[in-house]
Swiss-Prot record:
Residues 1-19 form the signal peptide. This is Neutrophil defensin 1. GO terms for cellular component: extracellular space; Golgi lumen. It comes from the Eukaryota. Its main location: secreted. Residues 20-64 form a propeptide. Keywords: ADP-ribosylation, Antibiotic, Antimicrobial, Antiviral defense, Defensin, Disulfide bond, Fungicide, Phosphoprotein, Secreted, Signal. Disulfide bonds join C66-C94, C68-C83, C73-C93. The modification ADP-ribosylarginine is found at R78, R88. It is found in: Secreted. Tetramer. Dimer. Interacts with RETN. Belongs to the alpha-defensin family.
């Protein structure tokens, strides 16, 4: 029983250690809100990420433009995740 309690404590500490950097990033994003017109269905998002997570386009070394769109990505784009803006879910498309 003691071992189970120790393992649970270690797991909670590990999860908290991973959550702190995510909270710091969320705080940075929340600190700098952008003013975007409500009638604009397209939102341009600038993100910093690990290169290993970047979209791979064979034969292309150009920068990839990514957008948050409703309801879905346009033809030729691929969905890489979800954006949350003004309480709504958007497709993150590149």
């Amino acid at each position: 029983m003691r071992t189970l309690a120790i393992l649970a404590a270690i797991l909670l500490v590990a999860l908290q250690a991973q959550a702190e950097p995510l909270q710091a990033r969320a705080d940075e994003v929340a600190a700098a809100p952008e003013q975007i017109p409500a009638d604009n269905p397209e939102v341009v998002v600038s993100l910093a990420w690990d290169e290993s997570l970047a979209p791979k386009h064979p034969g292309s070394r150009k920068n990839v433009a990514c957008y948050c769109r409703i309801p879905a990505c346009l033809a030729g784009e691929r969905r890489y995740g979800t954006c949350i803006y003004q309480g709504r879910l958007w497709a993150f498309c590149c």
